[in-house]
Amino acid sequence: MLQLAQGHDLHIVEDDTYAHLAPAHLPRIAALDALERTVYVSGFSKILTPAWRVGYLAAPAALVDRLIDTKLLSTLTTPALTEQALAHCLEHGLLRRHTERVLQRLEAARSRTVKLAESHGCRFATPPRGLFGWVDVGVDTERLAQAMLDEWLIAPGALFHATHRPSTLMRVNFATSQDAAFWRALDRARAGL
């Protein structure tokens, strides 16, 4: 990807919004590239609160002024109180400690969700990690979503595919998929398809 960007004089935007919730993985593209052709974007709303719309980016020096201008033109102001509160959290190690607690709770939620899913005959397409997982339910998840619409909302795999092809996979949020009633409803809906 980096070679293509270089060859076509393009920049890559690496959106890493869930960085604080993701397990350690391969190096970021921006790190491999030393910010020559990449713009790294992340934020704090997923780990702290959605109301704190404060993010950050790292970019090639040649792009920084244009990115600042774009930010100023598109948002006019920045919530100073939120920025100050976030700076306090960063300076005093509060974000790190908070992140550790959130990750512990997420691990417990993930474990409960995996047990529930597997006890209802589902399997994970990839090892469960981070905030989201891919569950194979064995039936077309778009049809399943329609069957469950009155009780629960699910995220069919087709929504996450460029060609919107049918899929037996659904994306689950481990933090919100721990209710046994959800998995029982999924069983009933599958049986009715």
PLM feature spans:
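PLP-dependent class I/II
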Residues: 1-193
